[in-house]
Structures are given as C-alpha cells and as structure tokens.
C-alpha cells in the first residue's frame, strides 16, 4: 500500500513538473515572439500590416478577467476594448471619426512598439529617393500634404490648381478624354517639392497600412474628399475574359502583363463637377482587393448579403453617400458606384460650357419657373439630380 502511494505521488509530481515546465517554455517562446526580429523585410508595408493586424486582434480578443486587474482598471480597459471594436466595425461604413481613431492607434503601435524611426520608415516607402517612388506613393504624399492645409477640399484643390479636369489626348486613344495620368502626378510632385518631417512620413505609411487593412484600398482617402462620387471596377477587362484568352492569344496576354491593356481592377473613376475622370495612375492591384472593397463598402445598417443569387445592393454609407455594388454573375466583374451629395453646389454656367449655353440655361430656368414637366436625361455623373432638385 505504501509503495502504491509512493508511486502515485511520484507520478503526480512528475505530471505537475511537466505542466509547469511546459508553461514556462511557452511563456519564454511568447516573449521571444513579442520581440521584433529585425531583418531586411521588417519595415516593409506587408510585414508591418501583418503586425498591426495581429496586435489589434490580440487587443480585441484578450480576456481581461485573467489579468488580475482592479475593479476600476478592469472597467476602464473594458470600455477601451469596446470602443476599439466599435471603431474597427465603423471603419468599414465610411465613418471618418472611427477611421481617425484607428489610424492614431496604428501610429502609436508603429512608433512605440514596432520601433519605426526616421531611418527605417523609408524602407516602407522610399521618401528620400523620388525616382523609386511609384505614382501612388507620390499621389498619397500630395494628397496628405494638401489635406493638412485644405481638409476635404484637398483633391478638388489639386485638380483645379493643375487643370487636371481638362480634356486631353493620351497614347492609344483617338479622342480626347478626361484622365489623370502618372506623368501628371510625377510632374506635380516635382513642382511641389515637399519637405516631409518624420511625422509626415509615418502618417503616409499609416494611411497605406490602414487602407489595405480596414479601409477601401487605393480609393480610401479619395472617397472622403468633397467630390461628386467615385467608382471602381466599371471598365477594363474582367478576370473571366483573361482566362478565356489565356490559351489563344499570347501577344494579347503579353500586353496585359505589361499593363498596356487595363484590367477591371485598374478601373478607378471619380465624378468631379459633372465630369467622369479616370485615375489612370491608381489601381486596386488585383481582383481580390477589388472584391474586398465591394464586399465592405455597402454594409452600413446591414442591408443583407451580396450573393450570387442577389447580385446587387443599393444602400447608403454613414455619411449619406449612396452606394451601388454589383458582382458576378449579374455583372462581368465586381464593381461599385458611390455618389456623394455633400459637395458645394455648382452653377449652371459651370456645368454647361458649350457654345449657345446662355439660351439653354435661360430656357431651363423658365421651364422650372413655369412648373413644366421636364425629363432630364444624361450619362452617369452629369448632375441630373442637382438640376432636378434645383441645387444648380
């Protein structure tokens, strides 16, 4: 009997020792993981984005009751956790306040925890070597600097200052069109000759991380601007077409690979003062990213699931913008249209710029004053609603 008890005691002690040892090793591994392993890729956008995702996931899923906090501290931490969850959800609805909160949190994480400084911040975006900056990098910097001065009028100010809404001829097009090219963005960046502080650089990096994590990809900041609207995926070749020609036309595929033929995920258009302007220098990068934006941009107030059987959704965003989203098989590709109604009112003289406009404007005014029944037709973004409701 004594021998049996002794054996049981040895077994229990052995199991207890194994559990304690495993716990200690696990804690040591966790501490080792918490330390940032610095290498050549540590401060790239992709790696920092994964770090931000992991940290925010840890913060929102931590069990506060296991930490042993005081009652007051527990209440405070619970409120902060609730606010964070609410803000992360509100980001996808277009709430600019939630967006600002999350961006400030990401800024603190990168600066205080991840160790981003004046030197390594340029590993994410090569701020100090303009020749290595992409058109999107330059545009992000331009928009950030103008936003500091003009707020949500930043993009309209850039467009008006450099006449980016004028008709122009571009290579491969027989007719003039409304388009903003990467060459124009590079020229603007060179002329502006911005001097960026470390805070400016880190804020640009934070915005880039945010827009691929919780934002609307390349259009995230543009959507907030005071413009008439924005759309994506509405032109260019869909993935379904690319797969069909994959085994038939090698020359055509080589043109696509060189980005000479625009894809649907390269399609970004803004509506500005009644003009549909293509942003040729911007892209979602892949159909998966365009799909992610489409799946998030319409979800304010839970309008229902966008599915193969229900291939479109019409809804409003939190700021009152109207959003329409379509998906295959109803459409050839994923696409969205966002119309904003909080822009400055344009006059008829600004909208109608063709010869003989005075007579057309006077006629329209008298028809409205006479309470006549009028049918207003035209392409998307030509301000039919504004005329109908008397805003113009």
Regions found by a protein language model. Name each.
Residues 29-306:
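N-terminal accessory targeting/assembly segments
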Residues 22-29, 390-392:
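Short, intrinsically disordered, charge-balanced linker/junction segments flanking boundaries
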Residues 255-370:
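P-loop NTP-binding catalytic core
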Residues 5-23:
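N-terminal signal-anchor transmembrane alpha helix of single-pass membrane proteins
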């Amino acid at each position: 009997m004594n021998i049996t008890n002794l054996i049981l005691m040895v077994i229990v002690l052995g199991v207890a020792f194994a559990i304690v040892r495993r716990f200690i090793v696990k804690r040591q591994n966790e501490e080792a993981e918490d330390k940032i392993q610095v290498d050549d890729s540590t401060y790239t956008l992709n790696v920092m984005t994964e770090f931000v995702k992991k940290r925010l996931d840890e913060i929102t899923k931590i069990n506060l009751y296991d930490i042993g906090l005081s009652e007051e501290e527990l209440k405070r931490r619970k409120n902060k956790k609730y606010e964070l969850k609410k803000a992360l959800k509100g980001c996808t609805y277009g709430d600019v306040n939630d967006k600002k909160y999350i961006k400030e949190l990401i800024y603190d994480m990168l600066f205080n925890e991840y160790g981003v400084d004046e030197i390594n911040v340029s590993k994410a975006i090569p701020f100090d070597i303009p020749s290595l900056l992409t058109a999107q990098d330059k545009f992000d910097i331009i928009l950030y600097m103008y936003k500091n001065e003009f707020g949500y009028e930043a993009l309209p100010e850039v467009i008006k200052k450099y006449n980016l809404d004028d008709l122009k001829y571009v290579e491969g097009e027989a007719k003039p069109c409304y388009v903003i090219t990467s060459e124009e963005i590079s020229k603007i960046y060179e002329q502006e000759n911005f001097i960026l502080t470390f805070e400016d650089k880190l804020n640009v990096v934070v915005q880039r991380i945010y827009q691929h994590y919780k934002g609307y990809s390349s259009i995230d900041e543009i959507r907030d601007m005071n413009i008439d609207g924005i759309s994506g995926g509405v032109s260019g070749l869909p993935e379904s077409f690319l797969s069909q020609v994959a085994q038939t036309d090698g020359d055509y595929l080589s043109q696509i690979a060189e980005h000479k033929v625009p894809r649907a995920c390269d399609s970004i258009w803004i509506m500005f003062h009644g003009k549909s302007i293509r942003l040729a220098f911007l892209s979602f990068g892949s159909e998966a990213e365009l799909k992610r934006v489409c799946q998030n941009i319409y979800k304010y107030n839970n309008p229902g699931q966008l599915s193969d059987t229900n291939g479109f959704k019409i809804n409003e965003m939190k700021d009152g913008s109207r959003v329409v989203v379509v998906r295959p098989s109803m459409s050839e590709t994923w696409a969205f249209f966002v119309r904003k109604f909080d822009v400055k009112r344009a006059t008829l003289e600004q909208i109608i710029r063709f010869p003989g406009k005075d007579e057309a404007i006077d006629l329209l005014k008298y028809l409205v004053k006479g309470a006549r029944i009028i049918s207003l037709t035209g392409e998307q973004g030509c301000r039919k609603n504004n005329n109908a409701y008397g805003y113009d």
